[in-house]
Structure formats: structure tokens, C-alpha cells
Curated annotation (Swiss-Prot):
One of its GO terms (cellular component) is cytoplasm. Belongs to the NDK family. This is Nucleoside diphosphate kinase. Its cofactor is Mg(2+). The keyword Magnesium applies. The gene is ndk. It comes from Rhodopseudomonas palustris (strain BisA53). Its EC number is 2.7.4.6. It catalyses: a 2'-deoxyribonucleoside 5'-diphosphate + ATP = a 2'-deoxyribonucleoside 5'-triphosphate + ADP; a ribonucleoside 5'-diphosphate + ATP = a ribonucleoside 5'-triphosphate + ADP. Homotetramer. It is found in: Cytoplasm. Keywords: ATP-binding, Cytoplasm, Kinase, Magnesium, Metal-binding, Nucleotide metabolism, Nucleotide-binding, Phosphoprotein, Transferase. PANTHER family: NUCLEOSIDE DIPHOSPHATE KINASE, NUCLEOSIDE DIPHOSPHATE KINASE DDB_G0292928-RELATED. Its main location: cytoplasm. It comes from the Bacteria.
């Protein structure tokens, strides 16, 4: 296994309930290091760019509105097989189908308000990280 970096967002439904510490604890317990983190309020342009892959989907507008509705915490995570490890600790998109002990099972409100985003591949992670962090902000 190789050490990888992946990208994570703690979404507005998580930050409004002050879950950053609880979610970070689950991430770290899964063996991932948080090597960069900042709390921001996404602009509409940032959210539209970030979720451009979904632009033609019927939920795109609602997704963008949700992501700009409150603060988010953007993160760079590092560890062995980080992308898969993070996806495992996040759990299924639908919290009712997520495994016990996962972030979404414990904290998500719904499929739409599912508390966390994680990159789906190392290549995607590199693109997503570059959207929110400069090299000198990643201090792992």
C-alpha cells in the first residue's frame, strides 16, 4: 500500500451541529492524518466549480445552495490507501445504508445532508485539493 492524500469536506449540516471534532476523531481513528484543514464559507462559484461533474443532474442547484448555506471544513487527509480508508469511514451516501460506526451512520441527517464529502480516486483528490489549498498550506 502507498501513502496517499485525499480531500474531505465537512458539510454545513455537520458544522452547524459542531461536529468537526467528533468527525475528525473518527477520521484519525481510521488511521488518517489531517495534514491541512480550514473552515471556510464556499462561494457560489467555488461550489459550482467543485460540483461541475453534476451540472446536468436535477439536484445540482439544490446541492450548490446547500454547500453555500453555511461554513464547511475543507481538509487534506494522508495515510496508507487514504482514498479508500476515508470512503470506508464515511459510509454509504444514504445514511440508512451506512455501516455502523461510520460518519454518515452516526451524523448524517439524510442523503442530501450527509455530513461529509470524500474524493473518489487519487486523481480526483489531487484536483480537489488544489481547488482549496496551496502547497504551503499542507504541512504533513
Amino acid at each position: 500500500m502507498a501513502v496517499q492524500r485525499t480531500f474531505s469536506i465537512l458539510k454545513p449540516d455537520a458544522t452547524e451541529r459542531n461536529l468537526t471534532g467528533a468527525i475528525n476523531a473518527l477520521i484519525e481513528k481510521a488511521g488518517l492524518r489531517i495534514v491541512a484543514q480550514k473552515r471556510i464559507r464556499m462561494t457560489r462559484e467555488q461550489a459550482e466549480t467543485f460540483y461541475a461533474v453534476h451540472k446536468e443532474r436535477p439536484f445540482f442547484g439544490e446541492l450548490v445552495d446547500f454547500m453555500i448555506s453555511g461554513p464547511v471544513v475543507v481538509q487534506v487527509l494522508e495515510g496508507e490507501d487514504a482514498v479508500l480508508k476515508h470512503r470506508d469511514v464515511m459510509g454509504a451516501t444514504d445514511p440508512s445504508k451506512a455501516a455502523d460506526g461510520t460518519i454518515r451512520k452516526l451524523h448524517a441527517k439524510s442523503i442530501g445532508e450527509n455530513s461529509v464529502h470524500g474524493s473518489d480516486a487519487p486523481e480526483t483528490a489531487a484536483i480537489e485539493i488544489a481547488q482549496f489549498f496551496s502547497g504551503n498550506e499542507i504541512v504533513g
